[in-house]
């Protein structure tokens, strides 16, 4: 009888051990399943992070390409500036009255602007008193230049002299002699008074100085004329 009871206790103990082992196996399986799910979630999160980083890089490249295109369009990239300066110093581009000299500047700044010219002689101290900014007529280059902002009395007798005003012409000086940076607009902007020459529109004209002599070595750029 005692041996039968002992056998029964042994059987119960063995069954409890088996049940404990089964529970342990189930718990381990659950832990492994949770760990696997965590690894999968981390993997998906890593993929999303890489995708966002790649998109950010693409956006940065697009912004760089756009900025480079805008700089080139304005003729302010180093290659364009070097070509322009070399052409100016060599007098390669003709003016309406004389070849380009060290006192005259010429810039083909974009495919929208035929040309922008600036006569630096009698250059004033203030932004709105410089002389002789002229815009070439885009549709018919053989027509006379349009006079813009002529405060120089020597130009008053020209056929492109005083006329109606043109809005939206602004000049920015990054270095005006020893003064500080400034932003302003021309107070006297003029166009050809004759109806045969259309004034068109002027936008985004800026003035940048190269070196310390803005009256001779200034660079204009424009986005539309």
Swiss-Prot record:
Transmembrane segments: none annotated. Minor structural protein that forms a portal-like structure at a unique three-fold axis of symmetry, following binding to the host receptor. The channel formed by VP2 may allow the delivery of the viral genome through the host endosomal membrane. The N-terminus domain points away from the virion surface. It comes from Bovine enteric calicivirus NB (isolate Bovine/United States/N ebraska/1980). One of its GO terms (cellular component) is host cell cytoplasm. Its main location: virion. This is Minor capsid protein VP2. It is found in: Virion; Host cytoplasm. Translated by a ribosomal termination-reinitiation process from the bicistronic mRNA coding for VP1 and VP2. It comes from the Viruses. Keywords: Capsid decoration protein, Capsid protein, Host cytoplasm, Virion. Homooligomer. The portal-like structure consists in 12 copies of VP2. Interacts with capsid protein VP1.
């Amino acid at each position: 009888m005692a041996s039968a009871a002992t056998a029964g206790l042994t059987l119960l103990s063995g069954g409890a051990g088996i049940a404990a082992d089964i529970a342990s196996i189930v718990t381990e399986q659950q832990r492994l399943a949770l760990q696997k799910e965590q690894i999968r979630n981390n993997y998906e999160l890593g993929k999303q992070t890489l995708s966002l980083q790649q998109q950010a890089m693409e956006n940065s490249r697009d912004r760089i390409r756009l900025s480079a295109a805008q700089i080139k369009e304005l003729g302010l990239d180093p290659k364009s500036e070097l070509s322009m300066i070399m052409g100016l110093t060599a007098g390669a581009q003709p003016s309406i009255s004389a070849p380009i000299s060290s006192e005259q500047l010429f810039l083909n700044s974009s495919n929208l602007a035929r040309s922008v010219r600036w006569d630096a002689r009698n250059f004033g101290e203030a932004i709105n008193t410089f002389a002789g900014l002229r815009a070439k007529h885009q549709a018919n280059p053989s027509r006379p230049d349009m006079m813009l902002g002529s405060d120089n009395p020597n130009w008053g007798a020209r056929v492109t002299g005083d006329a109606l005003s043109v809005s939206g012409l602004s000049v920015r000086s990054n270095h005006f002699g020893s003064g500080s940076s400034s932003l302003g607009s021309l107070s006297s902007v003029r166009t050809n008074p004759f109806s045969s020459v259309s004034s068109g529109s002027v936008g985004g004209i800026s003035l940048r100085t190269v070196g310390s002599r803005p009256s001779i070595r200034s660079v204009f750029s424009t986005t539309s004329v």
